[in-house]
Amino acid sequence: MTRRERVAEVTVGGGFVAAAALVAAMVPFDHPVEVVPVLLALAALAVASRVRFPVHEGFTVPIVLVFVPVLFLIPLPLVAPVTALALMLGGLPDVVRGRIPPSRLLFAAANSWFAIGPIVVLAFAGATDAQTTPVIVLFAALGAQFATDLGASAVRERIIRGATLREQIDDVVWVYAVDAALAPIGLLAALINPDPHYSILLLLPLLGLLRLFAT
């Protein structure tokens, strides 16, 4: 890891930790904390983070597919830390196989900024389940996801390689197009099944299919 990378990760990753802590302190727990849903969310997000497929000149992961129902599966204050931990778990196999150094797992915090925006929007709107959340709020949550992710990425890339915001937008527009296409599928799974546990399980075969076509 270069000096610029260390500065970027401390800045962006540290900012995420601060934001997640602020959310946890200010956003009320809309339902009780249960171990099984938290573990299910953790596992689903970790599995999704392992699925990579090419998009334009880069790649993306379909994590938004399960992230949407996770927003309604566990209390909102837990979504950000669970997301960051899941990304770390998703990177463990690569560490074990020697593909990446253990220090790369610390990138998980900076890569989890996309979770902050939707949490804030849903908490502000008082949303507790997919069925009763207004469509405009859902669109706002998706937009907030893109905004916080782009903001964090822009800061990171500015520090590392001096990239402009315009260059960042050009790089991620295809990634966000994929996210925009997958998010409604995750929402549909949450809408048609009143039990969010099964909503996530229903999406696992699709993740497997995406993984198959990505190889």
Model-assigned labels for residue ranges:
Residues 1-59, 65-170, 174-179, 183-212:
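Short helix-perturbing small/polar motifs within transmembrane alpha-helices
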